Amino acid sequence: MLYSIKMRAESGSRHISGAERIVERRDMAQAMDALTRRGMEHPNGPAEAVTVTVRPITRPLMHIQALPVHEPHVRDQHEARQVLTEELRGMALDPSPVLDLLYSLRKPMRGAVLLDVTGMKRLEPDPQRGVRATCMDYTGNRCEGKNHFREALCLASKVAHCPQIIGELCISDDPDYTTGYFASQVRGYVRIHHIKQAGQQLGGRIFLFRGQQAEIGQCVDYLENQPVMVVMESL
């Protein structure tokens, strides 16, 4: 049987770190130990509480391929924002409201903004919690410290597989990690350096939703509950 293991680290009421694995029973102890240590050692500050939750996987595990990776040459934050602008224009979207929202995400959210691209309206039921893309892992994950790139690619690949999500934008909430991305099924994973300045206390992600009102629940259920294993080649 497979198990979902999730870690959440907090300082007071502030979320500072989260990570997860999907493992077989024989690998549970090692995964739990690695996630606990990771929760205690995070650039957002020391954790006052680390919670590790273990649940059996009860749905069939879906295997998907990782998105292809593209890495444009970017020299500074202005050029990074220009890359995002061009990606959004390529989807026939007005970049301004999307990017203004992205760069205003300063209070840590456990999840993402779910943005209806038709009316530029936020759809997440709880704006403080957001919509969480969870219950996923990737092949070859040995839990040897944090791998920003692989973990981001894993999450982006799962999100892009959702029929109602046409794109995702992300800035890491780690203050010293300045690489973000744009991702979609059409464009793949566009890795963008200098998306923010080192030390900036901002970060978050936006899922771009296009669909019917009745499909919101289906979309959120897939993102939060469908177990997914992302197949990655050696990167």
Swiss-Prot record:
Its cofactor is Mg(2+). It comes from the Bacteria. Pfam families: BioW (PF03744). Its EC number is 6.2.1.14. Keywords: ATP-binding, Biotin biosynthesis, Ligase, Magnesium, Nucleotide-binding. One of its GO terms (biological process) is biotin biosynthetic process. Belongs to the BioW family. Homodimer. This is 6-carboxyhexanoate--CoA ligase. It comes from Desulfovibrio desulfuricans (strain ATCC 27774 / DSM 6949 / MB). The gene is bioW.
